[in-house]
Amino acid sequence: NPAVGCVVVKDGRIVGLGAHLKRGEPHAEVHALNMAGERSEGATVYVTLEPCAHHGKTPPCCDRLLEAKVARVVVASVDPNPLVSGKGIARLREAGIEVVSGLLEEEERRINAAYRKYITTRMPYVTLKIALTLDGRIATRTGDSRWVTGPEAREAVHVLRHRHQAIMVGVSTVLADDPELTARLPVPAMQPVRVVADSRLRVPETARIFDGKTPAVVLTTEQADPAKADRLRELGAEVLVCGPGPRVDLRLAMRRLGEREIASVLLEGGGQLAGAMLKAGLVDRVKLFYAPKLAGEDGIPAFAFAGPERMADALRLEQIEIEHVGGDWCVSGVPVREGGT
C-alpha cells in the first residue's frame, strides 16, 4: 500500500491528522477526519494521494469526506491504481467540493516510488545496496568484508531492510556469510521475506535463512536437484523455478515475486548478482555506502559485469542524493543508460 498522510485544516489551524498505517485498516483521511470531528465541516483536507472512490478492504474515503462536509481537498497526485485513478477526484468535484491536484507531486512520486511501480507493472521496486571502499571494493582479496562501513551505516541498512518487503542475495553470500537477513533495530521492525538466487540449489539446509522466523524464498532453475528442492520445502521454504538455466532468469524471478504481492526488494547480493540485475535493467535505485578505505586492485569489485567500450555508454546515476552517515557516505541515485532507464 502507498504511504499516505492527511491533514485537516480549519481557519488556519490543524484540527486533524492521520496516516494509513496498515493494510486493511482505515485510510489516512478517515483517521484525520475522526480526529477533527465536527470541525471538519468547511475545512480543507490535504492528502498525499487522491481519495479512493471504490469499495476495497475499507469503505470509500470519498464517502467519508462527503459526510464530513469538507469544503476543499488538496492532493499531491492522482493515484496510479486503475481502481482509483481520477475517479476519486471526479466524484468529489461532482459533489461540489473544490479539488486541487499537483501540490508537491514530485515529492509524492519519490516517496511512493515502490507503490507506483508495483501497481502499474506488478513488478517489485528493487533497491540495490552495496557497502564498498572508495576504490570500489566490497571485500579484501581474501574475501573479508567485516566491516566495510561503520556502525551508523550498518544501522541505516537495517532501516532499509525494515522498509522493504524482501531482501535478496545470491547463494555465494549465503555460503560465505550465512546471514540472517533480518532487520535488527532498537525498536520492533517489520521483517522482510528472505530471498536467495541459487540456480543449482547449493544453499545448505542448515542456513540461518531457514530458521523459520520469517519466510524464505529460493529462486532456482530446472537444472536444480528436485530432491533438494523438496527438502527445502520441508524446511518451510518456497522454491520457485525461474527458467531452464543455467542461471536464474532474473526478470521472471521478479515477476514471480510480484505475483506474491512483494512490491519492494532490497538487493544485498555480491558483485555477480548486482551486476546481473543492473545489466538486466531490474534495479530502480542504487544506494552505495562508501567507507573512507582503500582495498587495492586485488580486492573484490562491487560490480561484476563487462563494462562498455566507450565512457558515453557507461551506466550512470541520476537524481543523486548524498548523505553523511557516521564516518561514511551514502550516494543514492537512479540508474540510467543513454536513451532511457
Identify the function of each model-found stretch:
Residues 1-3, 125-126:
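Short, small/polar residue-rich loop motifs at catalytic or cofactor-binding pockets
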Residues 3-12, 130-131, 331:
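Short beta-strand scaffold segments in enzyme catalytic cores
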Residues 8-107, 193, 217, 222-224, ...:
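Zn2+-dependent cytidine deaminase-like catalytic core
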Residues 11-18, 107-120, 208-214:
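A short, flexible N-terminal coil/short beta segment enriched in small residues
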Residues 24-25, 89, 103-131:
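Proteins enriched for Cys/Gly/acidic motifs involved in redox and nucleic-acid/cofactor modification
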Residues 38, 94-97, 101, 116-120, ...:
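Generic secondary-structure signature for well-ordered alpha-helical cores
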Residues 54-56, 81-84, 107-112, 134-140, ...:
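Short, well-ordered, mixed-charge alpha-helical segments that flank or form enzyme active sites
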Residues 125-127, 132-341:
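Enzymes that bind and transform nitrogen-containing heteroaromatic metabolites
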